[in-house]
Swiss-Prot record:
InterPro entries from the UniProt entry: Brix (IPR007109), IMP4/RPF1 (IPR044281)
Segments of this protein annotated with the region Disordered: 16-49
Organism: Schizosaccharomyces pombe (strain 972 / ATCC 24843) (Fission yeast)
Highest taxon in the source lineage: Eukaryota
Name of this protein: Brix domain-containing protein C4F8.04
GO molecular function, a single term: rRNA primary transcript binding
A cellular component term, taken from the record's GO annotations: preribosome, large subunit precursor
Swiss-Prot/TrEMBL GO biological process terms: assembly of large subunit precursor of preribosome; cytosolic large ribosomal subunit assembly; maturation of 5.8S rRNA; maturation of 5.8S rRNA from tricistronic rRNA transcript (SSU-rRNA, 5.8S rRNA, LSU-rRNA); maturation of LSU-rRNA; maturation of LSU-rRNA from tricistronic rRNA transcript (SSU-rRNA, 5.8S rRNA, LSU-rRNA)
């Protein structure tokens, strides 16, 4: 076909060949459907082998991936890590301090207000003067706070979140994207002040477990089930999706008991990406960096850290 010099004739020949190719493909599919109708085992075998390749299935192996049953060494580490007091019989109660970057906008304050509603036993303090994050963390630890959450803003857009576990770290720095407050979510509900359930999903590495335990330590471990509220932090390809919903029960005639269930989003919703972990209290200049992943520097799309 490439030897045909006339453009119009060449296009006609190409379309004719393409039509014949599609026709043959359709005939093969019809023939295969007839065979599979006679022998269902052929269809089952074909579908079992026809598994599409995804980034997750081609994931680069990470030796820190945690199996379904953690080994004794990992269990010993978890018993002595910075968050162990929240998962032991002691059931330490978290106390979170929320603040913002200097001279934050109204939208950032609105977002902070909604976070206070998400995290039980959280308080907000407006940031004044030139006090730095490590100084705020030191003062907060003396006043009995267990965690510090700082919202960062750039050009009146909330773009990052710093989470510091008190009094001695670790500290986590996340970039934020796709932020929507409750009033920006269509048909959103209103929270009732109950302690929510927490769903942490798909954290599979040792670093991922540390991040998951950091978020778990922000919530009281005894949710008030009657409130029917749930906070979900879902990890997919190292993106952390934050959502808050309420279980809703509605009358449905097609259900056996006449009642159907659903979810009503309460907000806010946003996406996080872990960029840095420091071993101690957050200090941008002198902090000891344990993990760092800068935007745009990912060498392999199949490599996941969490």
């Amino acid at each position: 076909m490439g030897k045909i010099k006339n453009k119009i004739v060449r296009q006609q020949q190409y379309m004719k060949a393409l039509h014949q190719k599609n026709k043959d493909k359709l005939e093969r599919r019809k023939e295969r459907a007839k065979e599979e109708e006679k022998d269902p085992e052929k269809k089952r075998l074909r579908l079992s082998e026809n598994i599409p390749a995804t980034i997750e299935s081609k994931r680069v192996y990470d030796e820190t991936i945690i199996e379904d049953k953690p080994d004794e060494e990992l269990q010993a580490e978890l018993k002595d890590d910075e968050f162990s007091a929240y998962f032991s019989e002691e059931r330490k109660v978290p106390k979170l301090l929320v603040t913002t970057s200097k001279r934050a906008s109204r939208k950032c304050y609105d977002f902070a207000s909604e976070l206070l509603d998400c995290f039980p036993n959280a308080e907000f303090r407006k940031r004044t003067g030139d006090i730095e994050v490590h100084e705020i963390a030191e003062a907060a630890a003396k006043r009995g706070y267990t965690d510090l959450l700082v919202l960062n803003e750039d050009r009146k857009k909330t773009n990052a979140l710093t989470l510091v576990h008190l009094p001695n770290g670790p500290s986590f720095y996340f970039t934020l994207s796709n932020l929507q407050t409750a009033k920006e979510i269509s048909n959103h509900g209103r929270s009732t002040g109950h302690i929510p359930e927490l769903i942490i999903n798909n954290f599979s590495t040792r670093l991922g477990m540390t991040v998951a335990r950091a978020f778990q330590s922000l919530f009281i471990q005894t949710p008030q089930i009657q409130g029917r509220q749930v906070v979900t932090i879902h990890c997919q390809r190292d993106f952390l999706f934050f959502r808050r919903h309420r279980y809703a029960f509605r009358e449905k005639s097609n259900m056996p008991d006449g009642i159907g269930t659903g979810l009503q989003e309460l907000g806010p919703r946003f996406t996080m990406r872990l960029r840095m972990v420091q071993k101690g209290v957050w200090d941008r200049k002198e902090g000891e960096v344990f993990f760092e992943s800068n935007a745009g520097e990912e060498s392999d799309r199949r490599k996941f850290w969490l």
